[in-house]
A protein has these predicted regions:
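N-terminal secretory signal peptides and thylakoid transit peptides that target proteins
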Residues: 2-24
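N-terminal active-site segment of His-dependent metallophosphoesterases
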Residues: 25-101
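Beta-strand-turn-beta hairpins that frame and shape the catalytic cleft
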Residues: 39-49, 140-150, 176-180, 227-233, ...
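Binuclear metal-dependent phosphoesterase catalytic core
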Residues: 42, 62-64, 68-69, 73, ...
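Acidic/histidine-rich helix-loop elements
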Residues: 49-69, 94, 124-135, 156-162, ...
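Active-site neighborhood of phospho(di)ester-bond hydrolases with catalytic His/Asp-centered motifs
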Residues: 51-52, 86-91, 114-120, 151, ...
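His/acidic metal-ligating clusters that form di-metal
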Residues: 73-85, 158-233, 262, 273, ...
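Metal-dependent catalytic neighborhoods of phosphoester/phosphodiester hydrolases
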Residues: 89-108, 124-134, 193-196, 225-230
């Protein structure tokens, strides 16, 4: 792989081919084969997995097998090289809240701790959500010097919403001394996709916090790469269920390295594709 190819961010909105480095100076570099070696693996200090859009209960889809397949593949990867956690980033079910118990039972077979975000097809009130999943619609947690913020982008009616900016303002202030912040939102809030929403106030806030490393989005089943909004990478993971999108159903693996760079790729669901490395932004 040629490791000298570069392009400016302004000329390149979406990363959808293997092995890229995202640099703080605005350059994007193709990565090289080093990132696929055992030596690379030894330099990983934190590893997690993101999957979205299972759409349990959607008519005329094989949703039970979609869930069992993704759970089995994540568990296989976890046995080989453990994850710290998993995020199921929205649209867990398809509209009918009666599917929540079966969807949760399927996800409870994950061998790794998992968190969930609410998508527009997850029709539940905030109170119902917390009763089902034992976690609120907006939540945060830490692993050493790394923070993780998960927030809803919808409601019981399935409305497309901007995240709660006041909640984010409070949480970003609380986590301002952390080395890295990773954010999980089902719907892209930068209007970078056909089905995204436009949340300029949120990105005004995000742009002031240089420890935000990435925003992870689902929702757009046909989006599998990385898009840039005000120097913040928005990272997509395609889908693992539903009836449209990429021709595979997969999940995204994210690896925080000892040098604080972030390496990420999609499993489709067996092979690595769409690899990229996010270097630390200049503080």
């Amino acid at each position: 792989m040629n490791k000298t190819n570069t392009m400016q961010r302004k000329e390149f909105l979406s990363l959808s081919v293997p092995a890229f480095l995202l640099l703080a100076n605005g350059k994007i570099l193709k990565a090289h084969d080093y990132f696929l070696t055992e030596e690379h693996r030894r330099k990983v200090k934190l590893r997690f997995v993101v999957a979205s859009d299972g759409h349990y209960g959607q008519p005329n889809t094989d949703y039970e097998n979609f869930f069992s397949a993704i759970v089995n593949r994540i568990n296989e990867e976890h046995r080989k090289h453990p994850f710290s956690f998993c995020v199921i980033n929205g649209d867990i079910i398809h509209d009918d809240k009666r599917h929540f118990p079966a969807a949760k039972a399927a996800l409870d077979k994950l061998a790794v701790k998992y968190y969930v975000s609410q998508g527009n097809h997850d029709h539940a009130s905030a109170e119902e959500w917390e009763s089902i999943w034992k976690m609120p619609v907006n939540l945060d947690f830490k692993i050493k010097k790394n923070s993780f913020l998960i927030a809803t982008t919808s409601n019981e009616a399935g409305t497309y919403l901007c995240p709660d900016v006041n909640w984010f303002r409070q949480k970003l202030e609380e986590h301002k001394e952390q080395d890295n912040i990773f954010i999980f939102l089902h719907i892209n809030p930068g209007k970078l996709t056909k089905h995204g929403v436009d949340c300029p106030e949120l990105f005004d806030l995000f742009s002031r916090h240089k420890n935000i490393r990435a925003v992870f989005n689902g929702h757009d089943h046909d989006e599998e790469g990385i898009k840039i909004k005000r120097s913040i990478p928005c990272v997509f993971d395609a889908h693992f269920g539903g009836n449209w999108g990429t021709d595979y159903r997969g999940f995204r693996i994210v690896e925080l390295m000892k040098d604080n760079s972030v390496f990420t790729y999609i499993m489709n669901p067996v092979d690595k594709i769409n690899e990229a490395t996010l270097f630390e932004m200049a503080k």
